[in-house]
Amino acid sequence: MMGKSSLLDEAYELCEEGKYTLALEYYDLVLFKDPKNITAMINKGVTLQTLGKHSKAIKCYDDALAIEKNNLDALVNKGSALHTLGKYHDAIDCYEKALKIQPKYAMALAYKGLALGEIGLLKDAIKCFNAALKIDKKFDLALDNKTIALELLKNNTKLKPKLLKKG
């Protein structure tokens, strides 16, 4: 029988091959043998998220956070799942918790920027993208979304005078 670390490795490989349902069975087996295995919890959550099962993924991240409340991967992945469910404020809370622990976490900054953009706070979103780009100049997610946010901001300011004239 394989050891728990090789089961984790197998599950990861299955995910790489797109065999997510089978990977979930492996993660469950790891967690049956080692109920506090945070890596298995988080990877199971990521796999569930990939399958579109965001609420179940959030439960996995919450389980990991119950054991290790400052786990950056669990916080950012939970934020990502909440974002996908349209719970932008809750997602922002997760990213802010991660940033309190690791202020120069480019991914958390970029994801926070995405969530801020979703609720219309484009200037704040751009600040987050800029901060992420200061840490990682080639971070495509931050660069691409900064460009989109700037364009939206520009178009939004062009529309305002026209709307005021009609009123």
Question: What do these predicted regions represent?
Answer:
Residues G3-K33, T39, V46-T50:
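Alpha-helical segment of the N-proximal tetratricopeptide repeat
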Residues G3-S5, I38-T39, L72-D73, A106-M107, ...:
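Helix-start (N-cap) detector for alpha-helical repeat units in TPR-like alpha-solenoids
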Residues C15, I42, Q49, V76, ...:
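Position-specific recognition of the canonical hydrophobic site in helix A of tetratricopeptide repeat
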Residues L29-F32, D62-A66, E96-K100, L133-K134:
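Conserved structural position within tetratricopeptide repeats
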